[in-house]
C-alpha cells in the first residue's frame, strides 16, 4: 500500500470521521467496513457513478482505503457513453445506482439502492504502484481521456488545503458539487484527512432544504463554482441563518470582479470569509488562493500558490519571465501535479510523466507584490494581420459596451 495513502486510516476502528445524510449520522469506519466483501488479494479498478449520497461517497472511500484505483464519472453519464468507457478500461467493479445490465458483469449485491457489479472474468491488471484515481477531463461527455492522479498527489494537495483553511475535527461541510469533479472531490478529501464531518446533500444551493441543513447541523463551510454564486446572488441571503459558517470557497473558473466584491461585502457583514481559489484537475484540484483581506485590492488575482510554486514563461521562447506585469504562460510546480493522462487501460501502468511540472495553458502575469493573474487561455489566441489577439480580452472589451454578444460567421471564415 502507498505510504501516501491517508485513506487507509479510515479502516482503523478509532477513526472519528462521520457522514451525515438527512437527519442521521453515520460513522465512516462502520459503513466502509460493510463493503469489505468486495476486497480481493489484488488491486481492483473500480468505476463509480458518483452521487452526492452517503452510499456513493462511502464506496469511493472504500475503494481508496483499500488501495484500489477509482474511476470517478458523473452520475448522469449516458448509458452508451458508459459502455464505451467500460470497453476502454474494463473495470473489475462497477458501482451504480442504476442496475443497467452491462455486458460481462453480474450484480453482486444491492446496498441502499446502489448496485455493486463484478466482472465475470477478471484478469490480472498492471497498474502503476502509486496510481489512485482517474478523473474526467470533460465532465459528462464520456471522453475516455482521464487525468491520472497518484496517492502522493492526493496527500500533498489535501494537506495544503487543510493547512491553509485551518480545517479542524469539529468542522462540518456540505456537498454542493459532484465529487467526480476535482473541486468537489477535494472538499470531501480534506474533511476525511482531518477527520471531520461531511453532509451528503444531493440538491441545489437555492433549495430551502440546503439552508435548513446548514442551520440544523451548524455547517462551517461549503464551496461553489461561478454558477452557484450567480444563483446565490438572486437570493436574499440576509433572510437565512448563516451564523455557523466560517468561510466559503470559490473555484472552478473566474468570478466577475463585481460578484467577488458583492459576496465579499455580503459575507463580511455576517463575519464569513469569502476565499477565491484557482486550480485544475491536472493539479489534483487547487493550486492557489487569494487571502481574503485582498478581495478588495487585488480582486481579480488568483493569489499565490499553495506551495509558492508558480512562474511565468515567455510565449515564444518558453523561458522564465522575471519582469513584473509581463504576459506569459502560467506554469505550476508541485507534488500535486498529476502523473499524466490515460486513454485506455494500458495507460494505467505508465509512470509519472509530468515530474511535478504543469503547463497550465493559462495566460497571465505576476504583479510587483508577487500576486498572479490569469487573463486568458493559450488556445483562445488568434492571429489577425500577424498580431496575436486574445479572444478573452476582446470579449471583455465588448462586454463593457454590450450586454450580449453574438458572432456570425460564414464558410468558417
Which role fits each region the language model picked out?
Residues 4-8, 12-41, 83, 149-152:
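Conserved AMP-binding/adenylate-forming core of the ANL superfamily
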Residues 155-172, 180-221, 306:
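Conserved AMP-binding/adenylation subdomain of ANL enzymes
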Residues 219-224, 233-297:
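Gly/Ser/Thr-rich phosphate-binding loop
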Residues 48, 334, 339-340, 361-413:
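AMP-binding/adenylate-forming catalytic core of the ANL superfamily
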Residues 24-25, 132-159:
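Conserved AMP-binding A3 loop
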Residues 34-77, 176-178, 388:
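Conserved AMP-binding/adenylate-forming
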Residues 11-12, 115-136, 143, 166-172:
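Conserved pre-ATP/AMP-binding loop-to-beta segment of ANL
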Residues 304-307, 319-351, 389:
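Conserved ATP/PPi-binding loop(s) of AMP-dependent carboxylate-activating enzymes
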Amino acid at each position: 500500500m502507498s505510504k501516501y495513502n491517508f485513506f487507509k486510516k479510515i479502516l482503523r476502528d478509532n477513526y472519528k470521521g462521520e457522514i451525515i445524510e438527512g437527519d442521521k449520522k453515520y460513522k465512516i469506519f462502520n459503513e466502509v467496513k460493510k463493503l469489505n466483501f468486495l476486497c480481493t488479494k489484488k488491486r481492483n479498478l473500480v468505476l463509480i457513478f458518483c452521487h452526492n449520497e452517503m452510499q456513493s461517497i462511502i464506496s469511493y472511500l472504500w475503494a481508496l482505503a483499500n488501495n484500489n484505483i477509482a474511476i470517478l464519472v458523473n452520475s448522469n453519464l449516458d448509458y452508451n457513453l458508459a459502455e464505451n468507457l467500460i470497453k476502454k478500461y474494463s473495470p473489475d467493479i462497477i458501482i451504480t445506482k442504476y442496475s443497467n445490465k452491462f455486458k460481462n458483469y453480474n450484480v453482486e449485491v444491492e446496498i441502499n439502492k446502489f448496485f455493486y457489479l463484478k466482472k465475470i472474468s477478471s484478469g490480472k491488471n498492471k497498474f502503476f504502484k502509486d496510481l489512485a484515481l482517474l478523473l474526467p477531463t470533460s465532465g459528462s461527455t464520456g471522453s475516455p481521456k482521464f487525468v491520472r492522479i497518484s496517492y502522493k498527489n492526493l496527500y500533498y494537495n489535501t494537506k495544503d488545503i487543510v493547512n491553509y483553511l485551518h480545517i479542524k475535527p469539529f468542522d462540518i461541510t456540505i456537498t454542493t458539487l459532484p465529487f467526480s469533479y476535482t473541486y468537489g472531490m477535494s472538499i470531501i478529501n480534506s474533511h476525511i484527512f482531518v477527520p471531520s464531518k461531511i453532509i451528503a446533500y444531493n440538491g441545489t444551493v437555492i433549495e430551502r432544504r440546503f439552508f435548513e441543513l446548514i442551520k440544523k447541523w451548524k455547517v462551517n463551510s461549503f464551496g461553489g463554482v461561478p454558477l452557484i454564486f450567480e444563483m446565490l446572488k438572486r437570493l436574499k441571503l440576509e433572510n437565512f441563518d448563516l451564523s455557523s459558517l466560517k468561510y466559503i470557497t470559490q473555484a472552478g473558473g473566474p468570478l466577475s470582479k463585481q460578484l467577488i466584491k458583492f459576496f465579499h461585502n455580503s459575507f463580511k457583514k455576517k463575519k464569513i470569509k469569502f476565499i477565491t481559489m484557482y486550480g485544475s484537475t491536472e493539479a489534483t484540484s487547487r493550486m492557489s488562493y487569494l487571502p481574503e483581506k485582498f478581495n478588495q485590492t487585488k480582486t481579480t488575482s488568483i493569489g499565490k500558490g499553495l506551495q509558492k510554486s508558480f512562474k511565468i514563461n515567455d510565449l515564444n521562447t518558453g523561458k522564465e519571465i522575471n519582469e513584473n506585469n509581463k504576459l506569459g504562460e502560467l506554469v505550476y510546480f508541485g507534488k500535486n501535479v498529476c502523473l499524466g493522462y490515460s486513454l485506455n487501460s494500458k495507460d494505467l501502468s505508465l509512470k509519472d510523466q509530468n515530474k511535478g511540472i504543469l503547463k497550465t495553458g493559462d495566460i497571465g502575469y505576476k504583479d510587483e507584490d508577487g500576486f498572479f493573474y490569469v487573463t486568458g487561455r493559450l488556445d483562445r489566441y488568434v492571429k489577425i494581420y500577424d498580431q496575436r489577439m486574445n479572444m478573452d480580452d476582446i470579449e471583455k472589451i465588448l462586454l463593457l459596451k454590450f450586454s450580449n454578444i453574438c458572432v456570425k460567421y460564414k464558410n468558417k471564415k
